A protein has these predicted regions:
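Acidic helix N-cap motif at the loop->helix transition within catalytic regions
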Residues: 1-2
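Acceptor/aglycone-binding surface of glycosyltransferases and processive sugar-polymer synthases
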Residues: 8-32, 37, 49-132, 159-169, ...
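A short, conserved beta-strand element in the Rossmann-like catalytic core
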Residues: 44-46
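Hydrophobic helical membrane-anchoring modules
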Residues: 101, 125-203
């Protein structure tokens, strides 16, 4: 805060309310402050901050509505993960593509840039996942609304300290949840976004 002053905002919440609700609160903050581009990433440097500009440029100048920092668009670019974790993540993305039809290689990625129109269109009340499957549901919902999604290759380096919260329970929840999400989408209408004007500010 001493270095960035008013540019750094810390939002504190009571208790554990889930990963998804934390993201949604951050999105709400960005929309309230009229930012046009909103990025999300892991704060443990698993995601390289130097890649942020590539995601931003893919949206601001490349025509994408959602830019994903992808581990799997050019082979498998993951460092310091055990092989079991790599295989679980890789095949989870294949599973999601097969079930949903979404044309995204890294469906579980958490490194993304959104244009504000995506976050304005997606109703947070209809996002049912609050765990890691939240990442899948946001991409799927954006795609169903007709937004353009692109993937930017990155190298994901696992955290040097701390432990992952990933578990078999979370994985199982995502597997079942993807089926439920796909079935639910058959009975839901996704209104296409109606473009108006676009300005050029970013957060």
């Amino acid at each position: 805060q001493q270095q960035y002053g008013s540019k750094l905002h810390l939002i504190e919440r009571e208790g554990k309310q889930g990963l998804g609700t934390a993201y949604i609160r951050g999105f709400e903050f960005a929309l309230e402050h009229e930012y046009d581009y909103v990025c999300e990433m892991d704060a443990d440097f698993s995601h390289n901050p130097n890649d942020l500009m590539e995601l931003y440029k893919a949206c601001a100048y490349g025509g994408a509505d959602v830019a994903i920092g992808s581990r799997y668009i050019k082979g498998v670019n993951v460092v310091n993960w055990p092989m079991g974790r790599v295989l679980m993540s890789y095949f989870a993305s294949i599973y999601v593509r097969l079930v949903t039809g979404i044309p995204v290689m890294d469906t579980t990625a958490g490194f993304k840039c959104y244009h504000r129109s995506v976050l304005e269109t997606i109703d947070p009340e209809k996002i049912r996942f609050i765990g890691y499957a939240f990442q899948i549901e946001m991409k799927f919902t954006a795609w169903k609304h007709g937004f353009k999604i692109t993937e930017v290759p990155i190298i994901f380096t696992d955290r040097a300290k701390g432990t992952s919260k990933m578990s078999k329970g979370i994985f199982k929840e995502a597997v079942i949840g993807v089926l439920q999400m796909k079935i639910g989408s058959l009975f839901r209408k996704y209104e296409p976004y109606q473009e108006t004007s676009v300005s050029q500010s970013a957060a």
